[in-house]
Amino acid sequence: MYIRKVHIENFKKFKGAFDLELNSDLNIIVGDNEAGKSTIIEAIFLALTGIFRNRYIRNDLNSYIFNKDVVDEYLTNVNAGHKANLPKVLIELFFDGEDAPPIFRGLHNSESSDSSGVSLAIEFDERFKEEYEVLIRGKEVQSLPIEYYEVKWYGFNWDNATSRLIPLKVALIDSDNGKLPNGSDIYISRIIKDNLDSDDVVKITQAFRGLQDDFSGNQSVKDINDGIKGSSGITNKEIGISVDMSSRNAWESFLMTYLDNIPFTYIGKGEQAIIKTNLALGNKKASNAGVILMEEPENHLSHTKMNELISYIKHHCEDKDKQLIISTHSSFVANKLGLSRLILLNGTNTLRLSELKKDTEAYFESLPGYNTLRLILCKKAILVEGPSDELVVQRAYLDKNGKLPIEDGVDVISAYNLSFLRFLEIADKLKLAACVVTDNDGNVNALKDKYKDYLHSDHIRICYDETVNSSSIEIDDKAYNCNTLEPNLLNANSLDEICKVIGKEFNTNEDLLNYMKGHKTDCALAIFKSKEKINYPQYILDAIQ
């Protein structure tokens, strides 16, 4: 059994409805910061356990789990006297597989399909309708009235759901989880407890009670308590200090994990991440879990340590009938775990490489540099034909804005001419801001025909020189194409200016172009590093707007 689909409405990052189809085995969710990766992981865990950030959601409702835009729209409308529907959070998990249980099968889901699954809804409790009407008729509503909300957790057949009843178990691995007040790690403490059977827990509880007895029986503590009793005039009852044993599981809050006699929280973050992951995948609950969730396993890890961790993950989860859902923005993680399981995320837009044309999918699977992720992880991509174009565009951006494009989240990617359309296919499906900087090669009509599907796009721009340079120049007895980067740079500047920047002397344009043709990258690097500024062709200026 596995999760076939996740449906989310108005939860944190996602405004309105968001659907994500999942693979039955491995899913690698890739997106930039704030893309919604963590929201998906948290939504799945919440719907399966009723727990959000270490607390049961029924006991810790707050307005911040609602999408902020939805809440703001509600407040604007209700305070303007308009009809305002109270926001609602809904998370649905659709189960599938041969062993999908009939227990939660029904039609009460967003698909209205006969499916097995669970829903968790956070919505207005109609029992408070009168109180709510009084509230909105009074003073201005400043925040979502969360005190009138309730949590509903049910199967698609309307039966109430609990984590015990849901047959699909889940383990969440988050290497950046919080700490207990005593400094120990919540996450690793829970993992170790999960590995203890009931007899072990009894033994630890008894040992901890023995520590309390030893503490209370210590002569120094007795003397202190006698002093407190003698100086207190607050009550007739005896006052003293001791170890807190008010809870049957009081020992848990005092649990401190050690590694080679060093407190766990004092070892390196990378080592912590690996130990947490290994313990979590190997503990009893994870062994029985059908779904394993991992948030950004690359955090704090070096290249070598990341290799070790990925190897362990693959070994542990292969052929073990587990569904693994990993969020990451590391190209290394995605590449190692498998491009075919990649899910690209940009807001509410998702894309699998399998949804691309077959030749495009095959192309990206063979890419060693993994520029696919560079495209999705930037605010805007400028696609250029090669390294020399990349250097010149970066310098043009620096001259105009006083900083490199990457500092503004703009990535200049050498896509090479033949792969422009492949990158644009991804940008188009994900609604990514992208710009192509290309030569017209002396045939503007052919270029327009090539990019005809994107010439009127709202988020994709094709930048090129609309004028064909008909200059007749021969180099080595061959006609020279004057509609490329180097001639365009020369046209925007003088012979002397270009010579000064590249540190060479030439008497004719032909000699300069001949040199630049054979030393493209060297000349571009000289332009990039030069203290002198030059002029740039208009199509490059258009690209950096």
How would you label these PLM feature ranges?
Residues 90, 97-218:
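Electropositive, glycine-dotted interaction segments
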Residues 334, 340-545:
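Acidic, divalent-metal-binding catalytic cores of TOPRIM
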